[in-house]
Structure formats: C-alpha cells, structure tokens
Curated annotation (Swiss-Prot):
<dbReference type="Pfam" id="PF01765">
    <property type="entry name" value="RRF"/>
</dbReference>
<dbReference type="GO" id="GO:0002184">
    <property type="term" value="P:cytoplasmic translational termination"/>
</dbReference>
<dbReference type="InterPro" id="IPR002661">
    <property type="entry name" value="Ribosome_recyc_fac"/>
</dbReference>
<comment type="similarity">
    <text>Belongs to the RRF family.</text>
</comment>
<dbReference type="GO" id="GO:0005829">
    <property type="term" value="C:cytosol"/>
</dbReference>
<dbReference type="InterPro" id="IPR036191">
    <property type="entry name" value="RRF_sf"/>
</dbReference>
<keyword id="KW-0648">Protein biosynthesis</keyword>
<dbReference type="InterPro" id="IPR023584">
    <property type="entry name" value="Ribosome_recyc_fac_dom"/>
</dbReference>
<dbReference type="GO" id="GO:0043023">
    <property type="term" value="F:ribosomal large subunit binding"/>
</dbReference>
<comment type="function">
    <text>Responsible for the release of ribosomes from messenger RNA at the termination of protein biosynthesis. May increase the efficiency of translation by recycling ribosomes from one round of translation to another.</text>
</comment>
<protein>
    <recommendedName>
        <fullName>Ribosome-recycling factor</fullName>
    </recommendedName>
</protein>
<keyword id="KW-0963">Cytoplasm</keyword>
Length: 187
C-alpha cells in the first residue's frame, strides 16, 4: 500500500501559517518603542473601502519614540486620524498639515499587563489554529486508512509525525509568546 497520498508538507505549511499570523499580530502590539509595524493592523475607510494605513500614506520612524504618517491625499487626513484613535493602541495623533505625528507614550504597568493578556489571547488563537490543522490531518489519515489507501502501520507512523510536528510548532508559538511578553515587560 502506498502512503504517498498524505501530504505532511501541506500540514506543516498550514501550521507555520498560524505561527506567521501570530507574529504579525505581535508586530501590532506596542512595546514602548516606535516601529512602523505597529501601525500595520490599522485599517482606514478610504474611497468607499477599507484599506491598510500604508496604502494611504507613508509610515516613518523619525525618533525612537515617534511615528509619523505622511498622508498622500489631504481628504484622507481625518479618516487616518480616526482609524488611529479607534485602533486601541493608545496613540494620540497630532495633525500637522499632511503629516500625522504619533508620540509613543511610556507604557505603565497596567497597560503592560493588558498587552500581555492580549498577546496570550493571540497565542491561544494560534494554538487552536494549529490544533485544527492537526485534526484535519488526522481525519485525512483516518480516511486514507479506512479507504484502504494506507496500512495501519503507515497510519500510526504518519500520525506520530503529525503529532511531533504539532508539538514542535506549538513550542515555537509558546517561545514567541515568551519573547513578546519579555519585550512588553521590559522597562
């Protein structure tokens, strides 16, 4: 019996996608230092549709504790300002002509704890996504065995490989959380 009908690479790709998605979510969590990626999750209502902030202006980091957004269309300034205020990042935009300045305030202990909880929530969502991919892979393996496309031994072997992969990716997710928590709590 051939076991080539199961694609563990696809399973790994999907699990790694959950990890990448988590890292993008983490990039949007403020740590007290200015980074352009902090504004990436912000969506602006522009021209009748939702657009990422980097499609309506240029994001700059002129100082370690300052971000700027150079808006390309004067009519978009209020929409960009509104999107930043409603983003939940705790930023207070200052409009200066076509430039929006965003001073990055020092994080207080309460906000650090709140950001840590948000990071933990994102991490749990990533773990769930990985477990869902694992479940899909296990269901596929059961189906292949049931349809006689795979022997019991091959099924057991592939199941163990999927479980090892799951454990590895969840370990990487947990390591990413530990790194982000340390970053947030650093004064």
């Amino acid at each position: 019996m051939a076991d080539t009908t199961f694609d563990i690479d696809d399973t790994e790709r999907r699990m790694r996608g959950a990890l990448q998605s988590l890292k993008q979510e983490f990039a949007g969590l403020r740590t007290g230092r200015a980074t352009a990626s902090l504004l990436e999750p912000i969506v602006v209502e522009a021209y009748g549709q939702s657009m990422p902030i980097n499609q309506v202006g240029t994001i700059g980091v002129p100082e370690p504790r300052m971000l700027t957004v150079q808006v390309w269309d004067k009519g978009m300034i209020s929409a960009v300002e509104k999107a930043i205020r409603s983003s939940g990042l705790g930023l207070n935009p200052n409009v200066d002509g076509m430039l929006i300045r965003l001073p990055i305030p020092e994080l207080n202990q309460e906000r650090r704890a709140e950001l840590t909880k948000i990071a933990a929530k994102y991490t749990e969502q990533a773990r769930i996504a990985v477990r869902n991919v694992r479940r899909d892979a296990m269901d596929e393996l059961k189906r292949l065995e049931k349809d006689s496309h795979m022997s019991q031994d091959d099924h057991k072997s592939w199941s163990e490989k999927v479980q090892k992969l799951t454990d590895k990716v969840i370990g990487e997710i947990d390591a990413a959380l530990a790194h982000k928590e340390a970053d947030i709590m650093q004064v």
